[in-house]
Amino acid sequence: MKSAADLQTVVEMTRSIPCAPAILPKLLKLAEGSSSDLGEMEMLINLDTGLATDVLRTANSAFFASNQRCDSISDAILRLGSKVLYRIAASTLTGRWLVHPVRGYGWEPGDLCRHSLCVAICAETLAKKMHLGDAATAYTAGLIHDLGKFALAYANFTALDDITNRVPDEFATWREAEKVILGFESTQVTKALLENWGFPSTFVSVGCYYQTPSECPGRERKIVTLIHAAKHVATQIGYGVGVDGFYYEPDELALKEVGFKEEEMDAAIPEILSTIQCFISPSGEIRFT
């Protein structure tokens, strides 16, 4: 399984999974638009019963509730606001997709979902603390950064076992093993999926370069480096980390260029853990809303 055709096969197999986060790019565009887009946003949310239920439940939760109950999606949109709504959608759709049973990487059920959520929260927290752009964008980028690994595992590649058996004895990094054994990298699968679904270039760059941000061209290097740093912190914290998680090298050049320091990332961990514990129970159950 080393040809470009195999990469395309993985992408096609994964695209067919129900509940794929394919509506997120359209929802993001609507969330960034004017109030005239609210009707279209309502229509889009109503197409997905599970998402509509999560939106209404959140709008009527103790945190957002007022004296009047929200009984419609249009009321919920007005109460929550488009940015909160998009965060709910990103978490619900991506999370629901990532909990499909898969083999490979030594994952227990839901591990990739837990790890992706942890990276998202790390990215959001670091973005706020270090003034590195929009925290909501960082959160979404963290959620979707590693979809290619899920795709490979979903495709049931026996080659993943081969990689596991040969790292670190034959290959220093998981990325190197992927290139030799598969003929392509999981980041290439992520890139292909995100492009196929119409995600903005920012997210495509994150999926493609988060392991090696120094290779990312242009203005998107900063958010790519942010996700690289968030991944490092999330791996230290440990939620859902697969067997691949400890075979990556930090891109010291990119981290230094953006201004990341080990002590600053370590200092953010208590706040990150506090937030994570709101979404992941001690038993590992995931609560997105």
Q: How would you label these PLM feature ranges?
A:
Residues 1-248, 288-289:
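Conserved alpha-helical "signature site"
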Residues 1-9, 252-289:
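Terminal helices and disordered tails flanking the catalytic cores of nucleotide-processing hydrolases
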